[in-house]
């Protein structure tokens, strides 16, 4: 079973402010995110409550897993679909992913969810879009642990300068 992290960061590893992206949407990054997380159609995306609320909808063609102690499926009776599950812990999420045998599982945020998965040492690789601008942020991606080595670099946009790092 494979777990990967996918994230866009600015200088200082910022990823958000007030539960929103601190930068205007970058089409190239959004397309890359969609392509990677959809994969062969049997992938999951894993997010915390605030990331789910900031997106405001389920992302299609992927199984959406929301980790939250305060949300539960009773809150979303009208919008629960076969492609969505609300779970109360990282451990429950890992067990669920094992049971469902998704091809790939992408951790998509936020800060606490990234940190917990990285601390468990089960993230195989990290796809990081690095935006070479500084933005005000109140949420940050943890420093990439030393066990990861930079594997690939790909330029994806010029203004602002964005590159894809694969760790």
Where are these regions (language model features)?
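Enzymes that bind and transform nitrogen-containing heteroaromatic metabolites
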Residues: 1-167
